[in-house]
């Protein structure tokens, strides 16, 4: 079991509804490990720098996730409720962590130009699982990620 976890890609998942977060977390296993599900841009901006340093945030907006902070996330993925300002806030928090060049996680935001069922519908979560797997597969293979704007690819 520990071996499967060590091979799973660690990520931080951000969204509005824990019911969707739980569904997506379970649907991404065993290849992708959700370290923590964060709710809201303010909490995420506060929590991610701790996660990047390998420690649990002192306060958490959610307790969904593996809680294993020993491997930094490869990506911070935000759901449909996140706008460009929220992305910028989290990006600034990541930059403030003072990571070595090239080690910061990629920030991905849901492409709202893609028609989806409305959250928290189960179908929304299923589509999100599929889209996250596709994008993270590209990332793992070193392929270029592209979307309608920077960071919007999921």
Predicted regions and their residues:
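Well-ordered, non-membrane alpha-helical segments in soluble/globular domains
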Residues: 45-63, 87-93, 125-133
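Structured beta-strand/turn binding interfaces of compact recognition modules in eukaryotic regulators
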Residues: 14-16, 79, 110
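Ser/Thr/Gly-rich flexible loops in soluble cytosolic domains mediating phosphotransfer, phosphorylation
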Residues: 93-145
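Extreme N-terminal segments of fungal proteins
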Residues: 1-61
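Long terminal accessory regions outside catalytic cores
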Residues: 28, 64-72, 84-85, 92, ...
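Intrinsically disordered, low-complexity domain-flanking/linker segments in eukaryotic proteins
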Residues: 53-72, 101-107
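Eukaryotic N-terminal low-complexity, Ser/Thr- and Lys/Arg-rich leader segments
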Residues: 1-9, 101, 143-154
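Mid-chain, well-packed structural core segment of small domains
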Residues: 71-106
């Amino acid at each position: 079991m520990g071996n499967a976890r060590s091979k799973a890609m660690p990520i931080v998942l951000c969204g509005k509804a824990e019911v969707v977060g739980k569904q997506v977390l379970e649907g991404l296993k065993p290849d992708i490990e959700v370290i923590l599900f964060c709710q809201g841009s303010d909490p995420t901006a506060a929590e991610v720098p701790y996660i990047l340093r390998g420690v649990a945030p002192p306060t958490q907006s959610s307790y969904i996730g593996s809680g294993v902070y020993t491997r930094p996330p490869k990506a911070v993925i935000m759901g449909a409720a996140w706008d460009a300002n929220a992305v910028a806030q989290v990006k600034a928090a990541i930059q403030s962590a003072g990571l070595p060049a090239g080690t910061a996680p990629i920030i991905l935001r849901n492409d709202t130009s893609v028609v989806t069922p409305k959250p928290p519908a189960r179908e929304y979560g299923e589509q999100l699982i599929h889209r996250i797997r596709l994008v993270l597969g590209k990332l793992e293979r070193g392929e270029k990620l592209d979307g309608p704007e920077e960071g919007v690819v999921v």
